[in-house]
Amino acid sequence: MVMLADALVKRMIEVGALKFGDFVLSSGKRSRVYVDVKLASTFPDILEMISEGMAAKLKDLEFDRIACVELGGVPIAVALSLKMKKPLVIFRKEKKDYGIKGDRIGEVKEGEKVVVVEDVITTGSSALSAARRVEESGASVAAIIAVVDREESGRNFMSLLKLSDLIEAHDSIQPTES
């Protein structure tokens, strides 16, 4: 697992998924570091590493379904669904007012155990919102897992990487001035 995490970090840095500057995160917080897992997940090798890493972390967990919130978690949840042969539900951020007017694509059945997948967790509000919706459907949350935990939520979420791992790796491969 360590080798996979190292390879994932290296590839994420190579494709420019770790950015430095002044950013406003979806949580509303400001940060000097942005982790663009959406960009990273557009590369098949990275997406495969993510799904393999998550599958390894979840291998001993009993669950029936994978859930995510649009948009960032979708490619990751789809890849994990394919890898683990588990059905998927995608929660919309807002209920549609056209078509079938749903708040999700797919279903959650009463009594199921569901794993919620996220791209990046900062405060955890998006993941916890999905977890609440799972529970409102009569199912239970078996786990919440993210590609990157920014370590700002005050909670211990399952993740493949911590933001500090990415920054440390980035700093170690940058040329130093002599």
From Swiss-Prot:
E.C. number(s) listed in UniProt: 2.4.2.10
SUPFAM superfamilies: PRTase-like
UniProt cross-references to InterPro entries, sorted A to Z: OPRT (IPR023031), Or_phspho_trans_dom (IPR004467), PRibTrfase_dom (IPR000836), PRTase-like (IPR029057)
Keyword presence, Transmembrane helix: no
Keywords for the protein's UniProt record, in alphabetical order: Glycosyltransferase, Magnesium, Pyrimidine biosynthesis, Transferase
Pathway of action: Pyrimidine metabolism; UMP biosynthesis via de novo pathway; UMP from orotate: step 1/2
PROSITE patterns recorded: PUR_PYR_PR_TRANSFER
Listed GO biological process terms: 'de novo' UMP biosynthetic process; pyrimidine nucleobase biosynthetic process
Positions with a binding annotation for 5-phospho-alpha-D-ribose 1-diphosphate: 92-93, 96, 118-126
Record: residues binding orotate: 122, 150
One GO MF term: magnesium ion binding
Cofactor(s), names only, from the UniProt record: Mg(2+)
Keyword NADP attributed: no
Catalysis: reaction(s): orotidine 5'-phosphate + diphosphate = orotate + 5-phospho-alpha-D-ribose 1-diphosphate
Organism domain of life: Archaea
Membership in a protein family: Belongs to the purine/pyrimidine phosphoribosyltransferase family. PyrE subfamily.
Function (record text): Catalyzes the transfer of a ribosyl phosphate group from 5-phosphoribose 1-diphosphate to orotate, leading to the formation of orotidine monophosphate (OMP).
Subunit structure: Homodimer.
Name assigned to this protein: Orotate phosphoribosyltransferase
Species of provenance: Archaeoglobus fulgidus (strain ATCC 49558 / DSM 4304 / JCM 9628 / NBRC 100126 / VC-16)
